[in-house]
A protein has these predicted regions:
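Soluble non-cytosolic domains of exported or imported proteins
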Residues: 7, 11-18, 106-110, 130
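Non-transmembrane alpha-helical segments in soluble domains
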Residues: 14-17, 21-28, 32, 116-120, ...
């Protein structure tokens, strides 16, 4: 991206995204080459919402745009590093050939503590009752549409820099 007529930060961002894409592709290719693809659940997600740190006159909301929901076009308040929706709402991609239907889209509200109960259920391990997360296996495998209800959180809680958010 060195030759692109973009601001320096935009070229760096594009390079980082391209590098992540290549590296994830290498991991997925290796799983396939080792014959582990259909026996491996891969999660991919971020740890926070988008950033608008690289704003300038041309891109006042940041070089990679505002935190806009790609399906609704609604802009979320906040960004990386705060407790508004734009700082907390992140996508997650799950891939498991033969088990998770490609192209599946869900609006299930989940968070990282849900990963542990999910993988332990898939491994056949019983979780203690005092674990914060919920298994999202029914949603991942399409079982919620087939009659196995997907449990949901009564509330979610975040803390950052002396602030709290409850949803």
């Amino acid at each position: 991206y060195r030759d692109e007529p973009w601001p320096e930060q935009a070229r760096r961002y594009a390079a980082m995204v391209s590098m992540v894409d290549r590296q994830v592709g290498e991991v997925l290719d290796l799983l396939k080459d080792l014959g582990l693809e259909e026996n491996t659940l891969v999660f991919f997600s971020g740890d926070n919402g988008g950033a608008d740190y690289f704003s300038n006159k041309e891109h006042p909301r940041g070089i990679h745009g505002a935190n806009v929901n790609p399906q609704t076009g609604v802009e979320y308040r906040g960004k990386k590093g705060n407790l508004y929706e734009g700082g907390l709402r992140i996508p997650m991609i799950a891939r498991w050939p033969g088990r998770i239907a490609p192209g599946q889209v869900s609006d299930l509200l989940w968070y990282f503590p849900d990963v542990l109960p999910t993988v332990t259920e898939l491994a056949g391990v019983t979780m203690p009752d005092d674990i914060d997360g919920l298994s999202i296996v029914p949603e991942l495998l399409g079982e919620s549409a087939a009659g196995r209800p997907q449990p949901t959180h009564d509330y979610l809680y975040w803390e950052l820099g002396g602030q709290t958010a409850i949803r």
